[in-house]
Amino acid sequence: MIEITLLGTGSPIPDPDRAGPSTLVRAGGQVFLVDCGRGVLQRAAAVGVGAAGLSAVLLTHLHSDHIAELGDVLITSWVTNFAADPAPLQVIGPPGTAETVEAMLKAFGRDIGYRIAHHADLNAPPPIEVHEYTDGTVWDRDGVAIRVAPTDHRPVAPTIGFRVEFDGASAVLAGGTVPCPSLDELAAGAGALVHTVIRKDIITNFPQQRVKDICDYHSSVQEAAATAARAGVGTLVMTHYVPAIIAGQEDQWRALAATEFGGRIELGNDLHRVEVHAR
């Protein structure tokens, strides 16, 4: 079984009720943090997960709302890990990830220096290993396998989606993307597809062109549902709601998805949990 927890279902727009985009995936005793939106560590704490307990951080792309708390994750995983010789935190993402991590650590350079000077058991900067991929297998440990494929979030590029597999169960995390053949292939037959969604029918009515522009590179609810249908997934899990879902609107969003997808449809608030079993 794979357990998916929507840690943050928000967007770049600050929302008092929704943290930034982030999803927790637990499989075979391993814990993966997919994207690092604002507030992610507080949401993770609510389900008993700390930064030092992460098996890896998986980044779909490098938009600010998806990496806003990456620096905090890197530092907190270091200062809260009390092992004598802690293993490096694994960070997996598209090309550009290593540069981004380096910049984050540089921004926290003074803090790192302060902590090394203060604590006798901290004698080196945070141990981080970064791996950049656009395609193929990126993880294969103790029965958990992860592979990636390109998605289409242009002009943001490159971007990737992740497929996590364990004991016959599978979950795909699409990140930000419009429909594309590579995502269809990655998601084919998966137990669940976690997909960012927007309401283009609402957004196109905004007067600001900058707001309308987000329709260029995000999937609408119906488009995400159509991707799920083409790929033959069991469950569509919607997240990254733009605009934010107002209480009482959930059935409306589900109905839009149901016009294109006949399977199980999941959406909800932060900390919404979905179990994915072998198919």
UniProtKB/Swiss-Prot annotation:
The keyword Zinc applies. Transmembrane segments: none annotated. InterPro entries: AtsA-like_MBL-fold (IPR044094), Metallo-B-lactamas (IPR001279), RibonucZ/Hydroxyglut_hydro (IPR036866), RNase_Z/BN (IPR013471). Its EC number is 3.1.26.11. Pfam families: Lactamase_B_2. The active site is at residue 65. Zn(2+) 2 binds at residues 65-66, 240. GO terms for molecular function: 3'-tRNA processing endoribonuclease activity; metal ion binding. Its cofactor is Zn(2+). Keywords: Endonuclease, Hydrolase, Metal-binding, Nuclease, tRNA processing, Zinc. The keyword Nucleotide-binding does not apply. NCBIfam families: PRK00055.2-4. Zinc phosphodiesterase, which displays some tRNA 3'-processing endonuclease activity. Probably involved in tRNA maturation, by removing a 3'-trailer from precursor tRNA. This is Ribonuclease Z. The lineage of its organism: Bacteria, Bacillati, Actinomycetota, Actinomycetes, Mycobacteriales.
